Amino acid sequence: MERLTSPPRLMIVSDLDETMVDHHKDPENLALLRFNSLWEDAYRHDSLLVFSTGRAQTMYKKLRKEKPLLTPDVIITSVGTEIAYGNSMVPDDNWVEILNKKWDRGIVQEETSKFPELTLQGETEQRPHKLSFNIDKSKVKAVTKELSPRLEKRGVDVKFIFSGGNAFDVLAKGGGKGQALAYLLKKLKTEGKLPINTLACGDSGNDTELFTIPNVYGVMVSNAQEELLEWYAENAKDNANIIHASERCAGGITQAIGHFKLGPNLSPRDVSDFLECKADNVNPGHEVVKFFLFYERWRRGEVENCTTYTSSLKASCHPSGVFVHPSGAEKSLRDTIDELGKYYGDKKGKKFRVWTDQVLATDTTPGTWIVKLDKWEQTGDERKCCTTTVKFTSKEGEGFVWEHVQQIWSEETEIKDDSNWII
């Protein structure tokens, strides 16, 4: 969040499983990839992305290796009981202190063990301020009615959350996704960075609290679960700031951005002809997102007018522009574009996708920009990432010129094979 010096234009706070990530109807993650391109193209430079998930950090990191998730500015895990910031996931110790008030995990564990209706979930889901169980839906009311006064009598304040049809979480009273969001908004306001608009996105019961925070827009994706829809019907059906999207998962989030007029909602992935693609704002980050989408389509054999495209690309490269391969080898940018010709369609019919992450542009001197990003490439189940730095120059009224591109293997990538990495 420190990279922003003014209030974010938009802060998206989204659940992951079956909200940002579609595990059942989108095996190629196309809706997620569309959102990714939109975010990096139009929002990353002046907005905040927050993931708020029921997963513990261990399981969140596992999901990142399985799905093309962007890197969030803030990650809220374990149903709003843990908050961390940035790439390094620096924990918020102040939030821990807040949750410690009137909380004793040992007492909660002791009292819940007396209920045979509660079956502990796996060890990864048990956290310092959260105990997670499975329970039959029909038993929830009876268990909470009896468990609540027992814990209260022992001086422990808790919150019960039922979601997913059978998941039952016992949290520290101050926890939960809604309280974590309220805390984050208060923190940003104190820093003079209260978002101009905030959009909360969810699909299940543990997302309910997100939609109760004042001055926050909300979207329930089309595949929202029964317990969330019941809450909406009883509590928020007349609230114009909360909608039930007609699109699933990430598609519903993109739909909500347009519905509430929070900013652009046309993903670069939905633009068929990049030669006609004009960004709303002049931003060299747009050029990078557009190029790597072109690269994906080129290798999938999905580009028409190939000569026109390559000529346009070469014209946007400085005559003496250089590309530094992750192996350390250097060659002309224009020669690199020429070499793309022999790779046209080599990934046709294969599961091949490319996406960009953390695209951030800095104007170093008038007319000169440095863009840094992570460029991911996936073929089948194999994925690789290079941290990429691009130098652009521009003149008023003219487009951006590619001056220099350098790539090094990212620490996140497990496969570092120079031989089949092109750019």
From Swiss-Prot:
UniProt cross-references to Gene3D superfamilies, sorted A to Z: 3.10.450.50, 3.90.1070.10, HAD superfamily/HAD-like
Pathway(s) the chain acts in: Glycan biosynthesis; sucrose biosynthesis; sucrose from D-fructose 6-phosphate and UDP-alpha-D-glucose: step 2/2
Cofactor: Mg(2+)
Keyword list, A-Z: Hydrolase, Magnesium
Biological process per Gene Ontology, one example term: sucrose biosynthetic process
GO MF annotation terms: magnesium ion binding; sucrose-phosphate phosphatase activity
EC number, UniProt record: 3.1.3.24
Record InterPro entries: HAD-like_sf, HAD-SF_hydro_IIB, HAD_sf, NTF2-like_dom_sf, SPP-like_dom, SPP_C, Sucrose_Phosphatase, Sucrose_phosphatase_pln/cyn
GO cellular component assignments: plant-type vacuole
Record flagged with keyword GTP-binding: no
Enzyme class: hydrolase
Catalysed reactions, as listed in the record: sucrose 6(F)-phosphate + H2O = sucrose + phosphate
Similarity comment text for this entry: Belongs to the sucrose phosphatase family.
Known partners and oligomeric status: Homodimer.
Function (record text): Catalyzes the final step of sucrose synthesis.
Protein name stated in the entry: Probable sucrose-phosphatase 1
Native species: Arabidopsis thaliana (Mouse-ear cress)
